[in-house]
Regions:
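Conserved N-terminal phosphate-binding loop of PLP-dependent enzymes in the Aspartate aminotransferase
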Residues: 2-426
Length: 426
């Protein structure tokens, strides 16, 4: 790959580092060399060769306020000056405690106990451990399996992979290695899932689902009735319900949290990605008092034995508090509503193309699903040549822009997709 680096090879750090870096989701022998970035601002990525790209996916769905927002930057700088990090075992700091209180007040339902970690995958691992140990602490060891759903993706660590779709996901190499759980269809009605829970409910600790939008598994949508059915089935069969809002949380679907649209709340929720406005890594797993009370005991073996080294990192918590400030002060959800309209209008021409299976929009998520994409790397390069950064997955081209994107920038993104898909049809 290094001999393909082109202009970037003139930079010593790039040419030398390329011999040692292992990139994500990439076959290193064939993947095009990564683009060297020297600066970000707003929705723009500036490359080392001087080109500027409009980011259509907000750095994997994180930079909801755009890059380099001054309020977040100032909060992080102020925290850096006093305390960048201190371990969270036996010690406490203001940023984490304030953030926990704010999240508890913001979340729907009775989600009030906040456990911090450092990535979305780990937040899911914590949720799975909470759910399993909840039953163990109640003296029930047989409820140790999960119901997850086809098309779902929950992360790349072992437990998270095990509750992701083994066929449509990215972890087929681990078939037969990971723990086996129940992978079901999202219920259009109660019958199939009802039958599964009738037969196996006494072994199921929890169901886990991405509310309204399954992200990395293909950007598939489902409706609020599905979430209501899951809540009702969880209650009927005495299993817990986990909502993975790592992608959908913080306004992406048009409400602060996707589950608000269904009027139901889970027993456990996971958050990350836009939690810090895309500035720093941070995640949280939040549980109801029902869950927390199962761990509240004089018995030390009933404690939740988990502790990421950088959990509740002070810089990440400062960024998250600043991001929540912006949601309170700025019209972010109104901006998402405007983006919804622009995406529907801008992507509509794709519906007329014979190679397009579906065009769908939810909040600040716009999706063009194709019959197939033969060469993802070539397609990504075509977008870069048009001055936009769009990263298709599977057979899907999608947009998840910053909520602060201008109408002209968003039109540039949708025009690039329409032009490219039209060209693919020929």
């Amino acid at each position: 790959m290094a001999d393909q680096a082109g202009k970037n090879s003139a930079m010593p750090w790039y040419a030398e580092g390329l011999e040692h870096i292992w990139l994500p989701y990439a076959q290193m022998k064939t993947v095009p060399p990564p683009l060297a970035v020297v600066r970000t601002q707003g929705t723009r990525i500036t490359l080392a060769d001087g080109r500027e790209l409009i980011d259509g996916i907000a750095s994997w769905w994180t930079a909801c306020h755009g890059y380099n927002h001054p309020h977040i930057g100032q909060a992080v700088e102020a925290q850096l000056a006093s305390m960048p990090h201190v371990m969270f075992g036996g010690l406490a700091h203001e940023q984490a405690f304030v953030l926990a209180r704010r999240l508890a007040k913001l979340l729907p339902g009775d989600l009030t106990r906040v456990y911090f970690s450092d990535s979305g995958s780990v937040a899911v691992e914590v949720a799975l451990k909470m759910a399993t140990q909840y039953w163990i602490n109640h003296g029930i060891r047989g409820k140790n399996r999960f119901v997850a759903f086809k098309g779902g993706y929950h992360g790349d660590t072992t437990g998270a992979m095990a509750v992701s779709d083994p066929d449509a996901g990215m972890h087929a190499a681990f078939a037969g290695v990971l723990p086996r759980h129940h992978i079901a269809d999202l219920p259009d009605d109660d019958s199939a899932l009802d039958h599964l829970l009738t037969q196996r409910g006494d072994t199921v600790a929890a169901m886990i689902v991405e509310p309204l939008v399954q992200g990395a598994g293909g950007m598939t949508f489902h409706n609020v009735r599905t979430l209501r059915r899951l809540r009702a089935l969880a209650d009927r069969y005495d299993v817990l319900l986990i909502f993975d809002e790592i992608f959908t949380g913080f306004g992406r679907t048009g409400t602060m949290f996707a589950c608000e649209q269904a009027g139901v709340a889970p027993d456990i929720i996971t958050l990350s990605k836009a939690l810090t406005g895309g500035a720093l890594p941070l995640a949280a797993t939040i549980a109801t008092p029902r869950i927390f009370d199962a761990f509240w005991s004089d018995d030390p073996t009933k404690a939740l034995m988990h502790g990421p080294t950088y959990m509740a990192n002070a810089l990440g918590c400062a960024a998250a508090n600043a991001s929540l400030d912006l949601f309170e002060r700025e019209p972010r959800l109104r901006q998402v509503a405007d983006i919804t309209i622009a995406l529907e209008r801008g992507l509509a021409p794709c519906r007329d193309f014979s190679n397009v299976k579906d065009v769908r929009v939810k909040g600040a998520i716009g999706v063009v699903e194709l019959d197939r994409i033969d060469d993802l790397d070539s397609l990504r390069t075509q977008f870069i040549e048009q001055g936009v950064f769009i990263r298709p997955i599977g057979n899907v081209i999608y947009l998840t822009p910053a909520f602060t994107i201008s109408s002209d920038e968003l039109k540039t993104l949708t025009d690039a997709i329409v032009k490219t898909v039209r060209k693919m049809k020929q």
